[in-house]
Amino acid sequence: MASKPLQYVVVERKITFGKHAGKIMKIAQPSGRGRIPFRRFCDEVARSTSFTRQEVEAVINYATEIAKDFVSNGDMVDFGDLGTLVPSFKSRAVGQEEKFNPNIHIEKPMVHLRPSKSYFTLTGVHFKQVPKKTKKSNQPS
C-alpha cells in the first residue's frame, strides 16, 4: 500500500500535570482519520490470498469467537502479532468489615487486548500538518 503522511493539527491545551502543569501549551493531535470498514479490510486481505472476502470474514469472526470463549474461561490467548487477549473486569472497593460478594462487587467482565509493542509502534511514518477544522454554525448569516 502507498504510504500517506499522518495528518495532524496543532491545538492549545492546558497541561494538568508535570513540569508544565497549569500552562497553556501547543500539542499535535491526529486528524483526518478515516475508518476502513470490515468488508473493505477483508477485500484487501482476500486480494493477497486464494480466499474470498467471505472466507476471510468468516475466519476472522470465528477466530475472535474462539478466542473470546478461551478468555471467558480465564485463559490468556496469544493473538499473534496483535498481542495477548486477557480476561479483565472492574471491581468495587469493599470495606474491611464487609464481606466481598463477587456477584455484587465485580462488574463489566471483558476481553482486554495487551497490544504487542513491536506491532503497534509505527516506524517509517512521516507527518503533515493540516489546518484545524472549524465548527459550522447553524445560525443564518
Residue spans of the language-model regions?
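Strongly charged
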Residues: 1-58, 65-141
